[in-house]
Structures are given as structure tokens and as C-alpha cells.
Amino acid sequence: MKNKFQKSRNIRIFISSTFQDMQSERDMLVTKVFPRLRQIAYERNVTLTEVDLRWGITEEEAKSSKVVEICLDEIRNSHPFFIGLLGERYGWCPSKETLIEHQAMPDRYEWLAADLDRGMSITEIEIQYGVLRSLEPVYASFYIRKTDEKTIETDPRQAQLKETVRNNKRYNTYDYCSPEQLGEQVESEFKTLLDHLFPKNKVEDP
């Protein structure tokens, strides 16, 4: 039986990472990797779209907006496709009171308040919602940037998140040293996925 995205031949891939320290990686994916993947998908009558929510906003601006709700909505709309990029930063941890103050606490995500009370970052909330807690199959992959000896990971929550991601066997996890290596890994992963979901010898008319 075909999934809804196989019937519609439409794939949306959500890219998750912290705001500030993954600009080079996101640029590599958006400007180099995804154009090539889109062409491969197009040749199979598939529309492939990456969801990159940077939009040029800073973390400070995000704290006073509905960016949390937008992220969760986009993850839901992109499910089951998800890319997680993890570096050294754990990311912005908004308080429940801050979101309520700015009227950015979405009612349809009732579980969000508990995650905020636990002090979760938006990045971990994205990962938990999009992948780790998903009861349905996911087409996810995670890419963990190797830390050089001079860089100290000071937040134990980030180390724990990386360990949690690594220990889950529902998806592939890769280590990378450079944006270029990341690009090669993502391109290979999603070429394989396209071959699996939309075999080249079974192209359907639009």
C-alpha cells in the first residue's frame, strides 16, 4: 500500500538545527545538495522541497514571535521526512511564560508545556516531536558535527541529546567534519531513499 506522499509524489524534508552555528551546513544543503536531489526527484515526477526556517531571523527575534508554532506545524506537514543537524550548542530554551506572554503557545500541542517545563530547547523539541516520539515510521537521518579538541561541550543536555539520537536505531546517524562531507552524506542518504520510494524504472506520469 502506498503512503500519502507516494500517492501525491510530493516530499517535504524538514531541516532541524540550532539557529546560529549551522549556517554553513544549511547553506551547503540548500544551495548545493537539494538542487541536485530536486532534479533527481523531478526525473521521477516527484516534487521535493526542503523546509529551511532560517528566514534571516535571529534567536532574539524568534523569542518574541510564533516561531515555535511555525516549526511544529512545518514538522507535521513534512512528516515523515526529517534531517537533524547537531553541533555544540543546545539552543534556545524558551520558558512557557514567555510564549504565553507573546500568545505563541499553540493549543493543539498540549504536550509542549511539559517539555518547556523540563527546560528543553526548541531544537530538542523538534527532534522529539518529529522523530523520537513518532509512533509512525519515519524517514529521518541525523548528522553530528565532530568536535575538535579545542571545543568543549559545556551543556550536558546537548551531550545527552546526542547520545539519545545515536542509540535509536530507527534511522541512520552520521558524523561529519565539514559542510562538504555533510553534503555528500545527505545526498547519498536521500538518493537511496528516492530509489526506495520512487524506483527509477517505475516512473509514473504526472
PLM regions and their residue ranges:
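Conserved catalytic or regulatory cores that recognize and/or transform ribose-phosphate-containing ligands
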Residues: 1-206
